Amino acid sequence: MAALLLSVTACAGPASQMETKPGTVVDHLEVIGADGTLLARTEVPRQTGWCLYWNHSVTGDGVIDCYVDDLGKMVLHRAYQPDFAAGLGHYPGRGILTSAEGGGYWIEDIDEPVRGNAYVLRVGSLAVNHRIVTDSDEINLSKMAEHTRVTIRLDTGE
């Protein structure tokens, strides 16, 4: 649980410019089903973030990707990986690899914008347990959309 709290509060990264006082503009993170149905929606104040948690489908170990609402742009800020199992790893030039307290690795300062403020995810089984965690909410994707395709989108109202 401490790792969960640490990673959620730590996923908020600095904006490249301070055009907006943190928390004064609120965007929404949406989960949209393959048929276009809105499955979930939660508030995300600008300059704050959220994390996508799941258990690796091969090893079962926890993996985390943390995003930031950087002035209305979805940005992948950091990622936690317990090891370099199938599909995991660090690529030179994409963030800074650091050892995590208690084991595993953080890839810090990835700061990679997500094209179109959205990405598609094939939600895993209940064992994979895909979930989005914000400072005030938790959306369990595996419970609502197991084995289906969803789009995770930052809605800025623009």
Where do the protein language model's features map onto the residues?
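Sec-dependent N-terminal signal peptides
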Residues: 1-4
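Charge-biased, low-complexity intrinsically disordered regions
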Residues: 15-26
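Mature, soluble, non-transmembrane domains
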Residues: 50, 74-77, 88-158
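Short, surface-exposed beta-strand/loop "edge" segments at domain boundaries and coil↔beta transitions
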Residues: 36-41, 60-62, 84-86, 113-117, ...
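N-terminal secretory signal peptides
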Residues: 25-82
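A generic structural signal for ordered alpha-helices
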Residues: 41, 45, 83, 110, ...
